[in-house]
């Protein structure tokens, strides 16, 4: 009986010894929300023009997207200590997941209906802003949360 007890204690100890490394090997980060970052420069003398667009139509569209549950938040960040070649602004948009192609098209149609503009009109408006606003890059990032 005593030998059996020792064997049981030894078996339990060994199983714990092997279980601890398995727990320790679990990746310490989990996938979080997606963050879309658009890098923008604005020509001198047009900061008010672009700020007015951002505070108006851009913000209205983001508020609608948030109300629909498509995004979780958005913000505009200014590059305070800008170096040559860097953007003036970063437009940030956060979402829990990314839509597939069909869902993306569905959302685009809902947005066009909301703003009462065709794709051609939206492109023309973007072209008008491109006279003083320049998108110099974009990134899609994913937040990594600690366990």
Predicted regions and their residues:
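N-terminal, post-signal-peptide region of Sec/Tat-exported proteins
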Residues: 43-90
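Sec/Tat signal peptide C-region and signal peptidase I cleavage site
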Residues: 18-24
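An amphipathic, aromatic/His-enriched active-site/gating alpha helix that lines ligand/cofactor pockets
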Residues: 26-29, 60, 64-72, 92-142
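Short beta-strand/turn micro-motifs at beta-sheet edges
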Residues: 24-28, 77-80
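Short, solvent-exposed mixed-charge patches
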Residues: 146-147
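Bacterial N-terminal signal peptides that target proteins for export
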Residues: 1-14
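Acidic/histidine-rich, surface-exposed loop or edge segments in extracytoplasmic proteins
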Residues: 30-45, 89, 102
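Generic detector of solvent-exposed, compositionally biased contiguous segments
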Residues: 24-26, 39-41, 59
